[in-house]
Amino acid sequence: MSNHSEAYGSRDQRREKYTQGKEFEDGTLETLESIISAVEDETLSKDYQPLIVFFQRGFGAQLVQTWSYYAQVNNHGKFSKTTSLLTKTLRVLSSDTSTVTIGSGLIRLILTDYTKVLYRGLNNMRAQLTNPILRLLKQIVNFNNGQHIEELVSYFDFSLPILPRLLVPSKSELANGNSSADSSKHDSLRFTFIKFWLTLISNASPFVRKELLTENFKIMSNLFKFMNKADSDKLSEHILSVFINDILKEKSFKRTTKTKILNELAASKIHHFYYSSNKNLVKKANEFFLTFGASRDFSVAFPDNCVWFKNSVADGASHGAPITVNQVEFQIHNKLLFNTLRLFKPWEDTLQLGTLIKILENVPELVAPYSIFLTTNGNYDPKMTSYWFGITLLINKIINLKIPQFMEKVDSNIPPATSLVIENILPSLLTKSSLVKSLQFETPIIRQLACQSIVLALKKLEKVSTFYDQKGWRNEKTILLNEFHTRIPDLPIFVSTLSNSLASNKDNRILPLSISIIFNYYSKMFPNLFSINLPSSNIYTDIMQKSKISGIEFAILDNYLQFQEFNSTQTRWWNPSSGGNSLFTLLLKLASSKNASNVITTRISNLLDELTRTNVIFNISLISPVMALVNSLQGLSLQVSEIDNMEQVWKWFDETISRVVKTPYKYVDMAKEYNYISPFIMCLSEQWKYVDKSGNPEFLIKWLILFLRNMIFIGEDHIGIDKLVKNVFPEVSDHDVNIYLKLDSFEENIKKTNSSNSLISSMKSSSFFQYISALPSKNLMNISRLPVNKLDAAGILFRVQLLVEDDSVVYDNWFEATACELTGKIASYMVTDTEFPIIKVLERYINFALPKLAIEKRNALLMKKSRFMCNLIGAVCFETGHQLVEFREIIQKVVFSGENVEEYANYNELYQKEDVNAFLTSVSEYLSTSALTSLLMCSTKLESTRNILQKLFNEGKTIKISLVKNILNKAANEDPASIKEVNISLAKFFEENKVCVDASSDPMGKLSLSETTSLINSFVSSDLNYLVLKAFYRWEHFSFPSFIPSIWRIKDSPLLSIVTTAALFKHMQDKDFSAFAHETISKYGNEIAKSTYTTSKSEIFDEILNMITTYIDFYDETKRNEILKCVLSQSDHKYHAATVRYIAAHNNFTYPGVETWLHKTLLYLTKYLSERKVISNSFFELLRAMAELLKLEEVPNKLNVKIINSQLEAILGSEWIKQIKVLEYVIVLIFCVSKKSIQSQRMVQLLLSNDSYSSIMIKDNDEDSSYRKFLSTMILFSLFSIDPVVNSTPIVQEKLLTFYSGTISSNDKLILKILETIESHTATSWTNMIFSWEFIKDEEEEILEAIGDTRLITKEREGLILTLQKNMIKKSIDRYVLERPQVPELYTDSNTNNYDATTRCDLVKKYYDDTERSGVDMYDPLFLLLLIIHNKELVKMVKDDEGNVTYRYEFENFLDCKIFQFIICSLSDCHTVANISYEHLSNLASSLEKKTAQMNLEKQITSKDNERKESDSDLIKYNSIYQVLIKRILYQRQQNQDPINPLIWFSISRIVDLLGSPTAPLHEKAYRWVLSNSTIRSWDIPMVSDVMMSYNKRQQDDNKKEIDMEIYYGELSWVLTTICKGIKTDEDYKMLEKKGVFEWLLNLINMPYLKERLRELIYFIFYKVQRVADDGGLNLISRNGIVSFFEVLNNNIKSRLPQDDILNNIGTLRNENRGTLNTTLRLAQEQNGIEKLLLGYNELVKSQKRLILWTEGDSDNVVKRLRK
């Protein structure tokens, strides 16, 4: 009370103050109130002038003072009224732009000086006073669209204890609940505060909103707590809308933020709204949960890299949270969502059911635990209750979920966990006993639903089984099938259920259908276990004896006939029943009826095809002949008037099918006379004479013609059918035969067909097949209809075939367009029907395209059209992705000799070579590499050669030198332009070393003498081959000794001799080459010097000049000057790269005209870069040559400053800075001129404002992006360093911060250097601008991949947002780089006047190369260690009672974000970094001690709470072990003991992870290691010795051998990973060698059951040793015999690999067995790793004379043996 009295005075004093000011203040308030009322009352034109005058006179401040005064004297009425008046005033001031400034001033006055008045009103906790304050705050938020929200958040303390209390409803409100009147709710404190709060977070920026929601958890908790009890439906809807739109759908909020705000409490309260009577609220709640859990873009679901795996396929670990459901343990990443699902009751309403299923679909890892959770609600015994029906629907929908996308994409040798997969197929609630009870339940609906669940489970099992086959998990598939089989009822149960169903209700067809489907799937999935005994009279026999069958009966028969294949008895479907038809005929009836849909017709046709396929009934054709038969019968069914006579047809079919099945070969022999047409047609013709033809047989003739015509269209021999009709069917007139069955004059016959009354005419509208068959050729381009089945597609192919074979159809644009249009229809159809055999027609066209030599008459038109069709078929296969392998195999088999096509296989001698070339060229786009190379070996057009070479190059293929020779020979007399294009392609192969030798005796693969001689003969065939020859000389297999005997063969070729002389300059010591070179350079040097080189030879001027430049020292000064004079006079070549190189080599800038030339050349560069949109290769060459010239010592003094600056402006302000060669040139340009010459400030501004530079630094992510970023930043660094004082501005600093990534990359180090310089000149730290910190955890990496790279620093309106990534910190630990190159000093006092550009360029290039070599994928240790002290979540500022400020380290946060581990790892760094790390460790130790002491004190105070006591004890123990570890580290430093190797520090950082994982197998050992000693010993690598010794100990204990070996492999994996990642220096290598680690690793490789991953780790350890150890680990060669060890290992693996080239056989292996492919690829990968190691050791051996003698020179033989 005393404090209060001192602040506000006594009651009497306050009353006196109030009385004195009452009259004036009341008058002021009344005036304002009248002004506000007047403005609000005006409707059209509002007059704000009185209000403006009121505030201009200073009454605004008095108003606020009066308001404050009323609060002080507790005049509640006046205070409330004044508060409301302020709210109205702000509302009016916000309504017009002329008064917004006044309102802003009023708000700032309130926030800066009168926030205590706001607090006083809120603390009163009475609706009369508090509600107006809340409305005032809401108006402040709304003012001018949220203009003052940030100021409100800054000045107003949202941590006030009163704010959460405002959300606690009164007892009366709780008693009334949601049913209370809206008016009363609007007056409640909770309602008003929620409206203010929702307005605030909706209008706040995302960053402010996040801070409000996360920092004020008590407010959010109280808001959630009473949502379902006190809030009206309308308010609840508003709350949910804000949650959805402003939290869940806020793109800047990460999932961790969303889960922190919308926690389990929120979900539980919101779920209550499902039971609201307000439908809109129910929909809104459902929308919330859909967004919360099912939305792929906005949900809180964290990505799961396990799904059906127990551990991550990436690293073998499980990162999920452990949960236990009904005594079953799971590791899940979405515990919040799982607990949310437990709230749902999907059996109560479909809305919850649909939402739950969508969440499970989005988060498939929850399916298994949720399925187990359902078992906690009770058993599944059948009952006629709503719960049972609801839970059945839920289970069925769970079973029906698709295979997760993650599983579809994953490629792992480790199979999924069967226990998880089975829950996705058959949830545990569906026990065998409950299913049996359901199948035997008396109510049919229960039995049907049980069958439905089993059917869905079997369907899912089939999909998963196929999926397992695709992934190569066949062993696990067997386990899965066995597990499923034990969970479903036995087959006799289903048979019994089927019999009981028929006995109780014969008309019920649904349940028998379900059981039939079960039998069908059962027979497919468990063929060896499938055997049922049906009674003699059953539903299947009953249906087959019926005269008509329905659709559902057909479905029953369909399944029955399929599972009968696996049963002991077979159905005689071909025999007619007594008084009825055969099943074959019955199915034809059903398929051809008017009411049969296309789906039913297709399904029956497929079934009949399956039945007839094993019998000799139809010939093999393009598609199933049954479809053609059904189609003809459909035409017959359209003849309504003749339907009564259909029985004749059905009887005819019965007799036909019965006989052809029983005696098929009789009809095969009969068909011999008719070109072996189908036996069915022959039997049909045999039975024709027995068909009753009384009445009107005309309809039979119509059908017969239609059927035979259909058969011809799908591939039956039309000549044989024509002969058969004439001999057996005399009733068919010759006129009809000619029109419908003959292919001659097909186009004329179509017109007659369309005008006749045949069945074809009547079917055109219903059958696409008949439509396309009767369409005139001229209309084939205008088909709007699409094929819907195989028969339709076959009709299209037949029409195309007729066009191809019709000689009257010429090959023109119309033919190409029509063929493309029709083939496009096939391609669109194959999108849905991938099995359509389009490849079957390929051989026919190949036969047309490649007539055999024996055929004298060649049809060129038919050949050309057929080649085009082969190309179209290849295009269809390529575009659809189906049958491409078969396409290639057919072509290779026909075209080449032999079945197995190797490279350069010979053509089949049955065909003319020219025909084969033309054919292969037409389909070259779709051929395999071997076929293409064979084609290139033969004579083909240069245009095709160029295209094929480009295709091979783009696919990364290699070609043989013999192919190059062949191409050069055949191009000799071709068009020069074509030759040049081909030569450019060949040169690329040489430059990329993609040309291999055919045969070589040289162990290093050099070209032999005979091969070189032969190749030189090919080169001299044309002078235009100089491009290939130039690349040939740089080829890795080029051998100068093999070349020199042939050198004089190129003497007569000017370009070749010039190129040879220039390229082989380094071999001038050779006598023969020296003579050749002197003759060449003398001849052409004299011609240039005398200016006698004619214009006709100007095309080789550049090559001559390049040669002269190379041999410039061989000319005297006079000759050089003569050549220079000639060069300067050549206007066509003045600005060529060759000219620049010569002038640079001549290096005489005092020669008349050279300086002028230099200025003009620079101007030419500027003009070119300013005007051109595309840069040519020749200009890039010019830039490179100019860069070399500018490095010369004399050049800087000759440069014009204005030209240089204008050129820099042209480049730095354009898009050309994205070109690496341009950037390299700019760096040289900057280095070669005086610092004072460049306008650095302007250039820095140009570069930073260039969007292209921003794009380079932020968006670029290609293979050259690293170098491009470095060059562009180096330019900025150089320009900045010219005048750092002037360039050190806040704008430059802010821009650079957005480009900085905080890594040790070369460009980041340069930016950091600039930032340090700016801070030193401005004396302000950029860390003051940090507004917010973000920390991205592992679970959010998937989001980063979706939205792109997340910058370390981003600029927002509020300030800088700094984002650290946990994954990046992990990488920084694993890939910690100790030797980090420092930024070179380019502008120091020592070289201020030294403009040696060459030295600087070399320094820059060396800096980049060294940085890239060391690795850049880690945070800069110094930057990170200094930055973390600014993060309030890591280091908090604490004030004690005396006002002293201390800093507390939040150890748990250090541990969680891996920074503690990073600190330990950085102890191996340089002294500066290590000292900072030790300082952090000291502070961490101090903070831990204080926290432990505080917890002990609290423990004593709250010792009565046993649960808390126990948890506190665990936490104290948890902190204590880290205290011990830190003290050990600090003690080691105090004792000044031997330095600790980096490997040990890295091992300790990994120990930290084990200490925090109590369930880890190595946790106990890690704990013991920490407690084992008081210091860190320089030779003690944690865990290594234990694991090395443990194997022998475990083998002595036979009882626990199997269990312990699994533990051992886990420990071994940890140790190997630690060594592999931790070995960084030569000292690490020596320490491991002393401990015998390498010998132990070699012994491990011999373990038979060592996992592939562990074996790879061992290989990589030796790989790192070769590069880390100073001598490469030579002792391993001499002492451990590692070379011979790996060579034996390599030979062993080679013997297990296929003999063929693996890469060329991947497609075959994938088709045969995915498991075999995986095994083969693993072996190939292991072999590749071993060969790399052997090649590395070979280089080490050759580097030591002692080892060469020791190995007796066998190292080269090792390489030979590898290449065999």
Swiss-Prot record:
Required for 60S ribosomal subunit formation and pre-rRNA processing. Required for normal accumulation of 25S and 5.8S rRNAs. Residues 9-23 have a biased composition (Basic and acidic residues). One of its GO terms (molecular function) is mRNA binding. It comes from Saccharomyces cerevisiae (strain ATCC 204508 / S288c) (Baker's yeast). Associates with pre-60S ribosomal particles. Predominantly associated with the 27SA2 pre-rRNA. Can associate with a subset of box H/ACA and box C/D small nucleolar RNPs (snoRNPs) required for peptidyl transferase center modification and with small RNAs snR37 and snR42. Interacts with URB2. Together with DBP6, NOP8, URB2 and RSA3, forms an RNA-independent complex, which is required during early maturation of nascent 60S ribosomal subunits. PANTHER family: NUCLEOLAR PRE-RIBOSOMAL-ASSOCIATED PROTEIN 1, NUCLEOLAR PRERIBOSOMAL-ASSOCIATED PROTEIN 1. Present with 5890 molecules/cell in log phase SD medium. Keywords: Nucleus, Ribosome biogenesis, rRNA processing. It comes from the Eukaryota. GO terms for cellular component: nucleolus; nucleus. It is found in: Nucleus, Nucleolus. This is Nucleolar pre-ribosomal-associated protein 1. GO terms for biological process: maturation of 5.8S rRNA from tricistronic rRNA transcript (SSU-rRNA, 5.8S rRNA, LSU-rRNA); maturation of LSU-rRNA from tricistronic rRNA transcript (SSU-rRNA, 5.8S rRNA, LSU-rRNA); ribosomal large subunit biogenesis. Transmembrane segments: none annotated. Its main location: nucleus. It holds the Pfam family NopRA1. InterPro entries: NopRA1_C (IPR032436), Npa1_N (IPR021714), URB1 (IPR039844). The keyword rRNA processing applies. Residues 1-23 are annotated as: Disordered.
